[in-house]
Amino acid sequence: MDLVQKQKSLQDYTKSLFLEGILDSQFLQLQQLQDESNPDFVSQVVTLFFQDSDRILNDLSLSLDQQVVDFKKVDPHVHQLKGSSSSIGAQRVKNACVVFRSFCEQQNVEACHRCLQQVKQEYYLVKNRLETLFKLEQQIVASGGMIPAVELGF
């Protein structure tokens, strides 16, 4: 695949992430903060999000598996995950966290377990898709190209 095809492929792939609701405009704002002085800014921020999210999801699993669930511990974790996913534009993770928090407020253990599975599913989806996006970007840079701006236009 030549450079122009790689760039077009990246643009199409990125658009699909927005069309599927996986990412929202916050991700574009994050990309705008990246420049020549810090070319890995977005991938660094997203990597930190992945590390924090893995820890939070593990903590949530442990908390919900307790004999007596302490929702005063569960809710702050969900709130933190909602905030961090919102800050990188991981829209579907954020939306799943909103539902999760409502069940925390109701102290509905069964529904919280289902929500945790949904959050994990959305998280692993966005993680996989962003890792693919970054690989495409790396291939373009390795070929001597520039990362093209994405015009969503929808």
From Swiss-Prot:
Two-component system major event consists of a His-to-Asp phosphorelay between a sensor histidine kinase (HK) and a response regulator (RR). In plants, the His-to-Asp phosphorelay involves an additional intermediate named Histidine-containing phosphotransfer protein (HPt). This multistep phosphorelay consists of a His-Asp-His-Asp sequential transfer of a phosphate group between first a His and an Asp of the HK protein, followed by the transfer to a conserved His of the HPt protein and finally the transfer to an Asp in the receiver domain of the RR protein. One of its GO terms (biological process) is embryo sac development. Strongly expressed in roots. Pfam families: Hpt. InterPro entries: AHP1-5/YPD1, HPT_dom_sf, Sig_transdc_His_kin_Hpt_dom. Interacts with the B-type response regulators ARR1, ARR2, ARR4 and ARR9. Binds to ETR1, AHK2, AHK3, AHK4, AHK5 and FBR12. PANTHER family: HISTIDINE-CONTAINING PHOSPHOTRANSFER PROTEIN 1, PHOSPHORELAY INTERMEDIATE PROTEIN YPD1. This is Histidine-containing phosphotransfer protein 1. It comes from Arabidopsis thaliana (Mouse-ear cress). The gene is AHP1.
